[in-house]
Amino acid sequence: MSDVEETVDEYEEQEEAAVEEHEESVEEEAGGEARQGGGASAAEDGEEEEGREAEDGPVEESKPQAPGPFMPNLVPPKIPDGERVDFDDIHRKRMEKDLNELQTLIEAHFENRKKEEEELVSLKDRIEKRRAERAEQQRIRTEREKERQARLAEERARREEEESRRKAEDEARKKKALSNMMHFGGYIQKAQAERKSGKRQTEREKKKKILAERRKVLAIDHLNEDQLREKARELWQSIYDLEAEKFDLQEKFKQQKYEINVLRNRVNDNQKVSKTRGKAKVTGRWK
């Protein structure tokens, strides 16, 4: 409901209230006049009857007559003159208001649509930017993977080359030792002399001999910087493996030692129990 309609309704309610108040005031005035007129006529009738009784003497009392029906004087209400309502003007204002509201809704709709389009464009830009960043990251990752594979291939080839060279050196050393043994019999004579003298090698000498056989000649004069770095890495790995093996052997030795102690304690306990049982049987038999 518009403001004009509310004003019209309020005006009509005010008119109805004014009419009702006017009717109530008219009814109250008419009732008061009737009551005053009735009282005056009754007083006059009483005076006339008293005069007649005084003149004529005592007469028989007459019965009182019932009063007639009360008819108040009704006055038609007066409707106050008010402002006339122009319904065309109200309709025009309502149409203008609806038109303004519709125009506001249309403008808000287009503004929201413009904002949504701007957000969509920005979202597309972010998606394209993120896609380009991912493509760049994938390209960098692929290049790094290729470099890593190439580096591994080079290391593998270098390791194979060093292994083949080491094998060739070992073969050459073995051939040289065999040729020396064939040409010189000093080693055989020394072995025969030791066997004849009956000299036996101690554990320390055996250990030294085994270490001398296992120890390889470290030929690093012909290696460049990368090869030296790789050689150091191999030596470090071998030391690491030996330390790990040493640690495992120590732990195994501790476990075996613990198990031996446990078994030894069990054997001692069993021997003590068996001795006490044998003594009890003997004493019981003699009893």
From Swiss-Prot:
Describe PTMs of this protein: Phosphorylation at Thr-202 by PRKCA induces significant reduction in myofilament calcium sensitivity and actomyosin ATPase activity.
Keywords attached to this Swiss-Prot or TrEMBL record, sorted alphabetically, are: Acetylation, Muscle protein, Phosphoprotein
Basic and acidic residues biased stretches = 124-173, 192-208
- Give residue numbers for the modification (N-acetylserine): 2
Please list the residue ranges that the record marks as compositionally biased, kind Acidic residues.
1-31, 44-59
- GO process annotations (BP): cardiac muscle contraction; regulation of muscle contraction; sarcomere organization
Could you state a single Gene Ontology molecular function term?
troponin I binding
Q: Which residues carry this modification: Phosphoserine?
A: 2, 197
Cited InterPro entries = TNNT, Troponin, Troponin_sf
Q: Could you tell me the superkingdom of the organism this chain comes from?
A: Eukaryota
The record ties this protein, via SUPFAM superfamilies, to: Troponin coil-coiled subunits
Phosphothreonine is carried by which residues? 202, 283
> For this UniProt entry, what's an example GO CC term?
troponin complex
**Quick one: where's region Disordered?**
1-85, 124-208
Spans of biased composition, class Pro residues? Answer: 66-79
Give the similarity note: Belongs to the troponin T family.
**What does this chain do?**
Troponin T is the tropomyosin-binding subunit of troponin, the thin filament regulatory complex which confers calcium-sensitivity to striated muscle actomyosin ATPase activity.
This one is known as Troponin T, cardiac muscle
Q: Which species is this record about? A: Ovis aries
Organism classification, top ranks? Eukaryota, Metazoa, Chordata, Craniata, Vertebrata
